[in-house]
Amino acid sequence: DSQSSTVFAVETKDTKKAASAQYDVKNIDVKIAEALGTTKENVSIIDMAINPVSKKLYIAVKSADGTPVLLSLGANNELKAVSLTDVNFSSTAVNNPPDETKKDRQGKPLSLMSISDMGFEDGKLLLSGLCNKEFSSSFRSVSFPFTGKAEEEATLELYHANHGRFETTS
């Protein structure tokens, strides 16, 4: 959840091992909109991830009114809403998120980019995004399961020779 600068881990109980899966994601925005009873202009695909064990595709979506929805796409290419009612989850807030009042050149809040990508390796959740430091491009490493301890954080400092200056948001 970039807006709140928080990472949520949701227990899906999706543990049945699968060898591989193929998905038809052509016009997936239209399929998602139809499943939600609206048009593609009223949904935003936030992220997609494949469960490495079950090979099921999960899609995080936001409706026009800002309501978050989690969908799954099974091997049969059928979209299903993932119920988040009474589900086990854990969360951790990202340290040093961008100031909510600061905006990019298009007027979007920088806080929406506190988490731009995630990966997982050797018990660590790896996060790239922006932070509130002078060189705001950051890379964070968070232990999982979440412990509540501060994550390791590094910022990227790049010198752009064409401009003759450091880039603070790369």
Regions found by a protein language model. Give the residues of each.
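Sequence/structural signature of beta-propeller domains
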Residues: 1-170
